[in-house]
Amino acid sequence: MTTPPPGGPNPHGTAMPAAAYGASRATLWTGVSVLITDTAGRILLQRVTYRTARLLPGGGVDPKEAPTEAAAREVFEELGVRLRISWTLAVDWVPSTTPGFDPGTCFPGEIIYVFDGGTWDGEQIAAIRPRQGEIEGVDFVDPVDLPAQMAPGNARRALAALHARTTDGAVTLEDGYPITPPPPAS
């Protein structure tokens, strides 16, 4: 088998040369969030040093890192707790026009995976050790109060993920809005 020359035919079946095909693809960031609740059904939100709005635990996916690995890493870095991540609650496409990003970042848009971090009891909550310099603290917030505590798209995403957890079905979102109706509750 021969390898096509650089810039030659694309071995993946398109009529475009490989370089042109690669350049035509969308460039997006990949991020993760983790939905953690307490036994009263309140959602863990972080007070961070770099924004006024609160956030779910999470962050960016590093190069060559799987989203589940990134979620586990972020929970450990931000909360000091080791957590196995496996269940996806939501996948959200965040447009490049989302307000709040410094123009210097050249924000291209983002795909954010929201994972289920489980329901934590008092012992798990007591083990939280917020990362100094980044996380000022954490609070468990009633779901109805999320829109007042978070940026609009983040609140919509968190609430959609919470709904997905209770209906046993992941949801696909665009800018925090479900693109299909959620499955019926069982």
Question: Predicted segments — roles?
Answer:
Residues T52-A53, P130-S186:
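Nudix hydrolase/Nudix homology domain
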Residues T2-S33:
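Acidic, metal-coordinating catalytic segment for phosphate/diphosphate chemistry
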Residues I36-T39, G117:
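Active-site beta-strand termini and strand-to-loop segments that position acidic
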Residues D38-E78:
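Conserved Nudix-box catalytic region and its N-terminal flanking loop in Nudix hydrolases
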Residues S24-W29, D38, V48, F107-G109, ...:
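A generic fold-level signal
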Residues G31-S33, R82-I85:
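Conserved beta-strand residues within beta-sheet cores
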Residues L35-T37, S86-L89:
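Conserved positions in beta-strands of structured domains
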Residues V61-R84, D92-G153:
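Unchanged
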